[in-house]
Amino acid sequence: MGYCSGRCTLIFICGMQLVCVLERQIFDFLGYQWAPILANFVHIIIVILGLFGTIQYRPRYITGYAVWLVLWVTWNVFVICFYLEAGDLSKETDLILTFNISMHRSWWMENGPGCTVTSVTPAPDWAPEDHRYITVSGCLLEYQYIEVAHSSLQIVLALAGFIYACYVVKCITEEEDSFDFIGGFDSYGYQGPQKTSHLQLQPMYMSK
């Protein structure tokens, strides 16, 4: 009963991860955040494989899913540090999340709750011609805190998924070992008793 509830919980966690990361992927696309887009895409694939492994009782898939969650937590911790400008990181000057190919920022920077965007003219000389120079004011919640909230939610789901993935793998392995112990995985097939036929040889006489 406990194994069934743990497996169902892991399926629910995988479903929640897919919903949350798809929502995050949409806004990362809108903000041209290429590094998060790539990480989200890999995460979606791994979560689907983990979900498949949970449904089909495939411990290898679940183990791979658990290993990826460790990397996923590490990535989200980095994103939190980036937006909170921990150490030498700067969300204003570093273009790590766009692979240094554009000056785009998080979509929430201009579209956060209560934000008012004002175009600045004339633009500074250093501003690229194909970019707007704007100021954002009046936000009820700054965009970096929205991004931190997204990453924090992903970390919570990943930790829960890791715990239940380890539990489900343990239960599946123990179940396979017990089944093997009683002879469930014998390589030879069962052969029923064979009937032996007794033939009586009698001499035959041919008339001339």
From Swiss-Prot:
Q: Which UniProt keywords apply?
A: Cell membrane, Chromosomal rearrangement, Membrane, Transmembrane, Transmembrane helix
Residues the record annotates as the site (Breakpoint for interstitial deletion to form SUSP1-NKAIN2) are K91, E92
Keyword Iron in the entry? The reply is: no
Is Manganese set as a keyword in this record?
no
Residue pairs linked by disulfide bridges in the UniProt entry:
none
**How does the protein's chain sit in the membrane according to the entry?**
Multi-pass membrane protein
Task: Name a biological process GO annotation.
Answer: regulation of sodium ion transport
**CC terms in the record's Gene Ontology section:** plasma membrane
Any transmembrane segments, and where? Answer: 1-23, 35-55, 62-82, 153-173
Q: In which tissues is it expressed?
A: Expressed in fetal brain. Weakly expressed in adult brain and thymus. Not expressed in any other normal tissue examined.
Q: Which Pfam families match?
A: NKAIN
InterPro entries reported for this sequence: Na/K-Atpase_Interacting
- Source domain of life is Eukaryota
Q: What is its main location?
A: membrane
Q: Which compartments is it annotated to reside in? A: Cell membrane
Question: What family is reported?
Answer: Belongs to the NKAIN family.
The disease tied to this protein in UniProt is:
A chromosomal aberration involving NKAIN2 is a cause of lymphoma. Deletion del(6)(q13q21) within NKAIN2 and involving SUSP1 generates the SUSP1-NKAIN2 product.
On subunit structure and binding partners, the annotation says: Interacts with ATP1B1.
Name listed for the protein in its UniProt record: Sodium/potassium-transporting ATPase subunit beta-1-interacting protein 2
Gene name per UniProt: NKAIN2
